[in-house]
């Protein structure tokens, strides 16, 4: 693994190795701390979008591993005033041992990684959110003991979370169902990847069909538009029936896990009652962002 830009960068063995290392680092941290695997290493934390969990978990994770993490808002860099992306990449690659970047276009991230000359980690693009999906899979494995053969259902917008969860779930040997309105389907290349897995993948617009006998149901914010705008009102109409409610989940497994990458819009993609009922696994999922990201850093920078 040279970078982590999208889930399809990983082989099944590499995915399992990341989760195994994350388990080890989490256990060590609970016992008092991890070895300074990143001693003398520097990590640029470059953000073009607002962030709570990604920024703070990377800052804490780099510190816990003995490295130095520098946060930078791209609006405050020369890149925010027109400096070409390729120049920023070639400069930061000479200062830092690794770059984490949260940005909009996946193509920008891919170009940056080609030029930086150091490992680059996707902190979220409009196409992919691999760090979050690694945390999701870690949480499922912790609570269920295995991933292979379990039914994972995603309900919502077929954007970054759906794209990454489909690929990650299939790489882990899960049965994956994606439930989304017809006009909010996942990326074409993701669907092409998924269809190679045959009956292990199912795409539907029917939430009741999708959650049937699911072991895990995941969702994410689907009303990403500014409240009160025409786009927001359109999304509210388009996603009627796609809220995770107690009634919808009645057809899932009795011990179904519910995951949400946060932030949650209660009353939109998930009801308040379902969110609070499943808060323990949702906040384990949030904590595990820290541990899987530490694992990725340790593998990329310390040969773990």
Could you tell me what each predicted segment is?
Residues 195-273:
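Rossmann-like adenosine-cofactor binding region
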Residues 65, 95, 115-117, 172, ...:
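Short, structured coil segments at secondary-structure junctions
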Residues 255-256, 261-304:
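Adenosine-phosphate binding glycine-rich loop
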Residues 90, 97-168, 260:
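Anion-binding alpha/beta catalytic cores of soluble intermediary-metabolism enzymes, centered on
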Residues 48-60, 142-220:
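Glycine-rich phosphate/diphosphate-binding loop of Rossmann-like nucleotide-binding domains
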Residues 1-56, 60:
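Positively charged, low-complexity intrinsically disordered leader regions
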Residues 42-43, 47-95:
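Active-site cofactor/substrate anionic-group-binding motifs, chiefly glycine-
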């Amino acid at each position: 693994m040279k970078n982590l830009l999208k889930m399809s960068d990983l082989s099944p063995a590499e995915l399992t190795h990341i989760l195994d290392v994350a388990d080890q680092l989490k256990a060590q941290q609970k016992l008092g701390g991890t070895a300074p695997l990143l001693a003398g290493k520097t990590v640029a934390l470059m953000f073009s979008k607002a962030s709570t969990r990604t920024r703070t978990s990377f800052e804490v994770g780099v510190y816990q591993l003995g490295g130095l993490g520098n946060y930078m808002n791209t609006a405050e860099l020369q890149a925010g005033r027109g400096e070409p992306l390729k120049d920023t990449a070639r400069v930061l690659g000479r200062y830092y041992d690794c770059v984490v970047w949260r940005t909009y276009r996946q193509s920008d991230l891919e170009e940056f990684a080609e030029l930086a000359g150091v490992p680059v980690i996707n902190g979220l693009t409009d196409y992919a959110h691999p760090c979050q999906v690694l945390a999701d899979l870690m949480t499922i494995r912790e609570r269920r003991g295995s991933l292979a053969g379990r039914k994972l259902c995603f309900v919502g917008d077929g954007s970054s979370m759906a794209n990454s969860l489909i690929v990650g779930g299939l790489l882990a040997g899960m049965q994956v169902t994606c439930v989304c309105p017809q006009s909010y389907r996942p990326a074409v290349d993701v669907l092409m990847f998924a269809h190679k897995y045959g009956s292990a993948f199912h795409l539907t617009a029917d939430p009741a069909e999708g959650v049937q006998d699911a072991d895990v149901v995941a969702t994410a914010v689907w009303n990403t538009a500014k409240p009160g705008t025409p786009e927001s009102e359109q999304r509210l109409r388009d996603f009627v029936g796609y809220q995770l409610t107690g009634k919808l989940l009645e057809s899932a497994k009795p011990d179904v896990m519910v995951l949400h990458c946060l932030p949650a819009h209660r009353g939109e993609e998930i009801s308040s009652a379902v969110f609070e009922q499943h808060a323990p696994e949702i906040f384990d999922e949030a904590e595990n962002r820290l541990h899987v990201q530490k694992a990725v850093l340790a593998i990329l920078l310390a040969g773990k």
